[in-house]
Design a protein with these regions (language model features):
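Noncatalytic carbohydrate-binding groove/subsite architecture in carbohydrate-active enzymes
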Residues: 171-283
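Active-site groove signature of glycoside hydrolases
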Residues: 143-174, 201
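Short, acidic/polar
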Residues: 64-82, 139-147, 210-223, 276-283
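N-terminal carbohydrate-binding accessory modules
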Residues: 2-8, 12-84
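Cleavable C-terminal sorting propeptides in eukaryotic secreted/cell-surface proteins
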Residues: 419-450
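Aromatic-lined substrate-binding rim segments of carbohydrate-active enzymes
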Residues: 74-126, 179-199
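Fungal extracellular Ser/Thr-rich, low-complexity intrinsically disordered regions
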Residues: 16-46, 300, 304-307, 311, ...
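Hydrophobic faces of well-ordered beta-strands that scaffold small-molecule active sites
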Residues: 53-55, 90-92, 115-119, 157-161, ...
Length: 450
């Protein structure tokens, strides 16, 4: 026994003579935000109703061709303002899918802020006038690369498959099947790659002639192609106004039986500046909560169109708050998110596909089949994105060669994917196994010597 004790001591000495590698300590972070799901006619974090109390965010506008979530200096500067305002969601219209977004998404998470993300950009999008040509494998590769990049973050709330592709021109409705096919493809990609089932939907223009048809179209047909939510951009409440004067009461009435969550993807009329944002009072009350899950104010920075609550000065290092910044901050404080379910129905239901008329030219619920070259992405992934400097996808790559069968986009995990968006586990300390192994070796030798 004395021999064993001496051998054990020697083994411990050998192990302690090899110091354990010192790992760089990661900065302490807030716990991950709970993921948001779409169920019934509302959004939820666990069993709690979630309301979007947010703002649209794209410094430089669409012509700026920049990604605010890849620029750490810019996003940190603006996230401080978001936190001060009290928003819980931002919408970003364009990102560079060749860049990392880890730092800015973590900063947003630490601030308690979710992201609603458009998957398109001016170079990679559905062309409303040439939808068949623009729905191609090159386009979908960019879309899937964006989805893959942002599905790993717990605070990615939702994806938009399109924004105002359908407008007041009747022939623009012919693009609807291609946007809906993109919705189907994103949902299938998430499932096939084993990624989190992030809600996917469409942001519509508020066009009275086809608003109802558009909403029904994205909620009809087989489940694999139906949207998870519907959103539209609304500027009809122009102060001084009211719930009834603005017509918002009718927009509640008209969607009372709609079977999906709805929110306003843009709101905030600028007819009589400065805006007071008093309509938030209705949006956060039982005037609307049974049907609507909040909305996103348009927009954060002034971009020459009359909107914006801050001015970005010079090299964008300074931010000047306007009166509207203070007004929005006051409104968000004055009208908190409701508690409870808000009267939302817990079950979802599909709509009947709209029939053809002068304002709606889609005559079938059939969708284009995914282009053959894009099918491989479902199992092998999209790979690196082309970014904002890519060649673009208009009239590029293979297009759809036929009509898809209903249910063809049903998902089944065919890849292990990345189902969790949490931080990696810390490196395992192997010293225990080293001690155990060496002790075992000396024990064996000691036994043989006895």
């Amino acid at each position: 026994m004395k021999s064993f004790a001496l051998l054990t001591l020697a083994a411990a000495s050998i192990v302690s003579a090899t110091p354990t590698r010192t790992e760089k300590e990661l900065p302490k972070r807030a716990d991950s935000l709970p993921t948001v799901t779409a169920s019934g006619k509302a959004f939820w974090t666990g069993s709690d109703r979630f309301y979007m109390r947010g703002i649209d965010y794209q410094p430089g506008g669409s012509s700026g061709n920049s990604d605010p979530l890849a620029d750490t200096t810019t996003c940190k500067r603006d996230i401080a303002k978001f936190k001060d305002l009290g928003v819980n969601t931002i919408r970003v219209y364009m990102i560079d899918n060749s860049q990392s977004h880890d730092e800015c998404m973590q900063e947003l998470s630490d601030a308690g802020i979710y992201l609603v993300l458009d998957v398109n950009n001016p170079k990679y999008s559905i062309n409303r006038y040439e939808p068949a040509a623009s729905y191609n494998a090159v386009y979908l590769q960019s879309v899937f690369a964006t989805v893959e990049e942002f599905a790993k973050y717990d605070n990615t709330l939702a994806f938009f498959s399109g924004n105002e592709v359908i407008n007041e021109q009747a022939n623009s409705t012919l693009a609807a099947p291609y946007v809906k096919a993109t919705t189907r493809d994103i949902k299938q990609y998430l499932g096939s790659r084993g990624l989190r089932a992030i809600p996917v939907g469409y942001s519509a223009a508020d066009v009275s002639s086809n608003r109802a048809q558009t909403a029904d179209y994205f909620n009809c047909g087989s489940d694999d192609a139906r949207s998870d939510f519907f959103a539209f951009n609304d500027y009809s409440w122009c102060s001084p106004s009211s719930f009834t004067t603005s017509g918002w009461d009718q927009k509640v009435k008209n969607f009372t039986d709609y079977g999906l969550p709805i929110f306003l993807s843009e709101w905030g009329c600028i007819a009589n500046p400065p805006r007071s944002f008093e309509e938030l009072g209705s949006l956060m009350s039982d005037d609307m909560t049974a049907v609507y899950s909040g909305g996103l104010v348009y927009e954060y920075s002034k971009e020459g169109n009359g909107y914006g609550i801050v001015e970005l000065n010079g090299d964008d290092s300074d931010v000047t708050e306007t009166d509207e910044y203070d007004n929005l901050k006051s409104a968000l404080s004055k009208y908190p998110a409701p508690t409870g379910s808000g009267g939302a129905v817990s079950s979802t239901s599909a709509a009947t596909c709209p029939s053809t008329d002068d304002d709606w030219q889609v005559d079938s619920d059939a969708l284009p089949a995914i282009p053959d070259e894009a099918k491989d992405y479902m199992t092998n992934g999209a790979g690196d994105g082309p970014g904002l400097s890519g060649d673009g996808s208009q009239n590029a790559g293979s297009t759809s060669t036929g009509t898809a069968e209903a249910g063809s986009g049903s998902v089944s995990a065919t890849s292990s994917g990345k189902s969790d968006g949490g931080r990696p586990a810390p490196p395992m300390d192997l010293s225990f196994f080293a001690v155990t192994g060496v002790v075992g070796m000396f024990t064996l030798v000691g036994t043989l010597l006895l």
